[in-house]
């Protein structure tokens, strides 16, 4: 209706499909590209069978915290190649699964030509004791900034070429929450009830 364009962050796991199913997926994604939508990369090493098959290895964690630069760089480079092989594009936007970016991931993104990341959830950290660990608790900015190659949460020393476009967050009764449609419905229901 409004001809709005969107970025779809894609896990390369979809490329683990075979034959007719893979063709169907690729055709759907190519139709999005024809409509001028963007396909970005969404990283989930632990559940991405296409990535695991390409690297001939299983990974146990979502969070970048559990991987070194070399591993992260390999994930990003291989996933980018999978997207190019299947869709003929080189993605330039990125979101780490479960918002679990870290400083090594920022370096890998820059080294692989990514221009935009959208993993930050300012003021929020979670899954501190499991494989989906993420921490954006030091960030209190809700506007875009260039990521730091020294500390991914540092919004002042913007020395990378990767622009962070954070996910909207808000404070509610002393707790920082993602601006998520589910929360909107829950908050509306709570206000209606009380």
Which residues does each PLM region occupy?
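Active-site beta->alpha N-cap acidic-glycine motif
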Residues: 1-35
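A structural motif corresponding to the C-terminal end of an alpha-helix
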Residues: 2-4, 31-36, 82-89, 152-160
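CE4/NodB-like, metal-dependent polysaccharide N-deacetylase domain
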Residues: 3-5, 64-98, 165
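Hydrophobic faces of well-ordered beta-strands that scaffold small-molecule active sites
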Residues: 6-8, 39-43, 92-94, 116-118, ...
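Acidic-and-aromatic substrate-binding clefts and catalytic sites of carbohydrate-active enzymes
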Residues: 12-25, 47-51, 95-103, 126-127
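Surface-exposed, active-site-proximal loop segments in enzymatic domains
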Residues: 16-21, 50-66, 178
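Generic structural signal for well-ordered alpha-helices
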Residues: 25-30, 73-80, 106
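Active-site-adjacent pocket scaffolds in enzyme catalytic domains
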Residues: 96-194
């Amino acid at each position: 209706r409004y001809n709005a364009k969107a970025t779809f962050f894609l896990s390369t796991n979809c490329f683990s499909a075979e034959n007719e199913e893979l063709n169907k997926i690729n055709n759907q994604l190519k139709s999005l590209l024809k409509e001028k939508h963007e396909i970005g990369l969404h990283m989930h090493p632990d559940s991405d069978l296409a990535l695991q098959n390409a690297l001939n290895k299983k990974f146990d964690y979502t969070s970048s915290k559990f991987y070194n630069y070399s591993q992260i760089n390999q994930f990003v480079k291989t996933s980018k190649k999978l997207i190019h092989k299947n869709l003929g594009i080189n993605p330039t936007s990125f979101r780490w699964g479960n918002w679990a970016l870290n400083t090594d991931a920022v370096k890998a993104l820059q080294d692989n030509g990514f221009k935009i990341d959208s993993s930050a959830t300012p003021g929020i950290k979670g899954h501190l004791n499991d494989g989906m660990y993420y921490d954006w608790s030091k960030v209190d900015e809700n506007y875009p900034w260039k990521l730091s190659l020294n500390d991914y949460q540092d919004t002042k020393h913007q020395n990378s070429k990767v622009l962070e476009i954070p996910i909207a967050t808000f404070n509610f009764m002393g707790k920082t929450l993602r601006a998520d449609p589910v929360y909107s419905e829950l908050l509306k229901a709570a206000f209606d009830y009380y």
